[in-house]
UniProtKB/Swiss-Prot annotation:
Gene3D superfamilies: Aspartate Aminotransferase, domain 1, Type I PLP-dependent aspartate aminotransferase-like (Major domain). The glycine cleavage system catalyzes the degradation of glycine. The P protein binds the alpha-amino group of glycine through its pyridoxal phosphate cofactor; CO(2) is released and the remaining methylamine moiety is then transferred to the lipoamide cofactor of the H protein. One of its GO terms (molecular function) is glycine dehydrogenase (decarboxylating) activity. Belongs to the GcvP family. N-terminal subunit subfamily. GO terms for biological process: glycine decarboxylation via glycine cleavage system; nucleoside metabolic process. NCBIfam families: PRK00451.1 (NF001696). It comes from Desulforamulus reducens (strain ATCC BAA-1160 / DSM 100696 / MI-1). This is Probable glycine dehydrogenase (decarboxylating) subunit 1. The glycine cleavage system is composed of four proteins: P, T, L and H. In this organism, the P 'protein' is a heterodimer of two subunits.
Amino acid sequence: MKFIPHTDEERRQMLKHLAVENTDQLFKDIPSELRLNRDLAVEGGLSEMELQSHMNSLAGLNTGVDQTICFLGAGAYDHYIPSAVKHILSRSEFYTAYTPYQPEISQGVLQSIFEYQSMICLLTGMDAANASMYDGASALAEAALMACAVTRRDKVLVASTLHPEYREVVKTYLHGPGIEISEIAYQEGLSQLADIDQKLDKKTAAVLVQYPNFFGCIEDLGKIAEQAHAKGALLVVCVDPIALGILKSPGQCGADIVVGEGQSLGIPLSYGGPYLGFMACKDKYLRKMPGRIVGQTVDVEGRRGYVLTLQAREQHIRRDKATSNICSNQALCALAATVYLSLVGRQGFKQVAELCLQKTAYAKELLAALPGYQLPWQTPVFKEFVLKTKEAPEVINRELLKENILGGLDLGGYYPELAGHMLFCVTEKRSRREIELLAARLGAIS
């Protein structure tokens, strides 16, 4: 395939400058047996109509929530998205992945980010929020690094009730700086407070917990905050934002940094994203927080305006000392969350959370009454719960899929001690009929 912008003469001049005879010499470090010494096996171009048909046929191979009844969660959730969210997102003024390079000119974009930050602060009970992160997992890892920078310590405690894939991302981020990670054991679906006490020491920068946790269980943040602060460590909380419609905010419970995955706030399910990481913290840690921050100010004539503030923390000012490496930002996803929260309002948001709680309780009651199924713990939960099964989860999910039902997550792949256990999710979208259908199908399988 030819690289169109360069002429033959330009390529000749570049090769001469590099003192090589041909482009193959530029790849001499790659063994010849690993090189593709032929043209790519790509067919000719397609017309727009043909391409659209081809893409539709590929998309048709997917099995998504539009074709099934979804009881699968574990970090990505099937919540209702008001149609106005997509409409507003599609406006040309907003539809880009990039922050303007002369940001103060784009006051509308900056104001939307400022409103997003304000809403995240209201939800989390924190003083300040950034303009968004890549996703919940990277936001948590960045928060761990931030806590180490704030405390100048090099150890973090990570709850084993945190999302297993989030924990893997945290391990990856902390491996390079050589930060020690110690996992907190769990019992009855909750982090063991005694284990936290035992592992906390003067080297500990932070305790990382999830609220509600991976099993849907609601951790006692107040007690964990007391334990962490007694040793000079910070409490970092990864939250489900929908749960904050009815649960106490992490800020009220003593959290220092709050992060989470914002996909539930108006962003559709998509394998590979893009999703939305959010981060908020107390005022005193603001300068250590990664990512862009939009502030409100007044111009020389006293008119309200919005600016990117504290930019010295960012990579376009001090790349080697920047607090993060965020380039293409998640501002469009942050806008989706802003529009969603604005549309549903305070009461609507609370109602979404209450519906999740009520429908989860109904599903728990029905499924636990079935022969061959039981609840391993009696811990209070939100939106998700663990169910012990007699049949193998793999068999159950295969049978459910025949009925166009996406079943729960097989926990045995993440927690060997929970082989034969499934994690079910029930959002506000699930109807009484769908929950009863799930119970009927599970009853038939057992």
